[in-house]
Amino acid sequence: EQLICVTQLDRIKIQFAARGVQRIQHDGHDAFRVRLPDVILRLQRREYFRLTAPSAHSLTCLIPVTIDGESREVSVEANVLDISGGGLAITVPSDGLVVAPDMEFPNCRLMLPETGAIVTSLRVRNLFRVTNRDGSVTLRAGCEFTQLSGNMAATIQRYILKIERERNARERTR
């Protein structure tokens, strides 16, 4: 017999087949002992690595919206939840921004620390209601970068790599 084990690590699905399963006691608790798997699958359906936005310095995106029947434009600030080379996810602000799938927002300004503004258009690809720990409900919008120049894409990739290197260095010192 074999047991299929599935888990997630950093939002990446990990799966393996466990053979030779034995029920044992470990530190006074029931547990399973298995042979090391021959193969471990890491399943990530992404073209780009996704970085959860650092809590040390929050990322924001300024989204221009037209109000007063197209006579005036204001920028609505949205908190960035995660970012990749292909797009980002934001918490939709409770006021000032109406969002629906396939909506496009031109001339958005992604504010990266130490880098400045990345100007791009965003297309909303998906929307999810998220229930927070305190019971409040927010809307999460997954957005794709459109009309992103090569230089701006490279800047985003450098930022992601820098933050990931810093996180890995902190993990190693623990």
Predicted segments — roles?
Residues 1-174:
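Structured alpha-helical
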